[in-house]
Amino acid sequence: MNRTKEPQTWLQRLENLHPYETLLYLGMLGSGLIFVFLVAAFLFSGLNQLEGLNHRIPVAFLISTFMLILSGYTATKMRLHYQEENIPKLERALRNTFMLGVIFTVLQFAGWKELQDMGINFRGLPSGSFLYLLSGIHIFHLLGAMIFAVILLLQLRKTQEDGIRKLILVTNPFEKMRIRLFTVYWHFMDAVWLILFFLFILSF
């Protein structure tokens, strides 16, 4: 007699997660709460304090947003190439994602320079201070993913030189999970920045 499988509760699904998955999701939850708290403080500090001061959103922030959106696309391609067992394309997509992350970070510093040239300093108006604080904390979180990307790149480089390692990579559920978690976290960082960028536009 066949028994219908009862749906698992959210707690049971949580218990069945790999420890790495649990850590990542809890970390994302914690990071999300930090950003929610800071965004709330940003809003209560007076979102329109910079209005009427002849300021504009830094061009570097605009370009960096495009770079991060593009990196989200390349991160998505990683999972597709892994499913195709195409390691060279997987490595290329990961490398492109990493490089776009580096470009994004450099452009963030350029954006801070533009803010300073406009007279918006970290110790000036509260709204101006939050522009630095929120974007800086976002960079800090993104750096963690970029460090992990370097580790994955080194692993993939060794894999291409060893057929056994390649076989293990494409058949090991743990390796599949690591790539999936990387893309999940990267897209999370994309989403956080897009929300911040929208608020930054409103502040000007």
Language-model regions, residue ranges each:
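...captures the hydrophobic TM-helix bundle architecture rather than a specific catalytic motif
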Residues: 1-204
